[in-house]
Amino acid sequence: MLHVSQLFFVPLCPKVSNYMNQKLSHIDFDQAGADVFCFDNGTQVREYHAIIRVQQACLPFAQQVEAVLNAYNSLLAQLPGAQAVFKRYFLSDAANQADAIVVNDVTDCAKSIIQQAPLDGTKVALWVWLMTDVQTSMTQSELYEVSHGQFRHLFNASAHNLAANSEYQMRLLFNEYIMQLAQERCTLADNCIRTWLFVNDIDLNYGGVVRARNQVFFTQGLTVNTHFIASTGIGGRQQDPNVLAQMDNYAIAGVRPEQVHYLYAPTHLNRTSDYGVSFERGTMVSYADRRHVFISGTASINNKGEVMYPNDIVKQTQRMWENVEALLVEADCNFDDVAHMIVYLRDVADYQLVRSLYAERFPGKPCVIVHAPVCRPGWLIEMECMAVKAVCLPNMPQF
């Protein structure tokens, strides 16, 4: 039996259609709960983002996994026609837990499994992105394909290898991904929209990841004079301690150049290339009926590339929100359009305070706070998010 304890309707764009809306809901299941964002603009494809969390932290891991999977299946039953297109499991101890996820979750979609402990004291949490009226399959390139209309959305998750160090591992990951994209008649520069790079012991191994990405991007025509790719580079551990870098990614086959725009917010942030790294602050992809906005991992930084408010978690959180909001505004969005948030904390002792700040500002928003050191030690907190907004752009292709 499920109980919906909160339900909010937020009009998106009444000038476009009265049917276009977003909906937030909290659903309590047996031993787990879900915060759900629904985007339904009256066209064929509805989208859902959900964060599912265990409600009893004292349960053994096996029961926590069961609670999350049961909640997911119950949620799916309430969303006619919806299919998962991407999942991410946040684990407290990947070495002992990852295999259980692989065995018990047989969903036919890309599944990211990473050790980034949920900071509410539980052992597992799940973010899932769902869509209706799409066809899903595994391609010969081993990317997961989600098809609707003229687009094929290509997802990959938990890619890793055992090369000698983080630089070699990252270079091999990108080279393999470039070959996978080529099999789909795509390129890294033209089709890849978003990457996630998880770095084991990020304080030690991030430099190698950065060097590899810079080198690969240069060979692919991704430079400060063209564009980079929205990304999160964050601490995260795979079940094998010899894996120093793990990658998830998302590309769109068939996307047109005029659909993709990059976000800069120069009043608040500088170009990442100014301090030697290669990613975009955010990317928006526009369709005839909706806009997707992918905000990269964002911290308390200014437009000179400096850490703002060292050792002050409250002010860093507020500056981070300000930076994210500036990027969203550039895409003609705001926090109401955000479908989910992932928050990364370096110090577990900051959790209760950060949780209270988020609960006050973003009540009911799908959000998970996890333990994951940020790429620069001075940053105590980082967040990423995705926004979905209804638009009316008849010159763009339909989603």
Locations of regions flagged by a protein language model:
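N-terminal presequence-like segments and the immediate start of the first folded domain
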Residues: F8, K15-A339, L345-F399
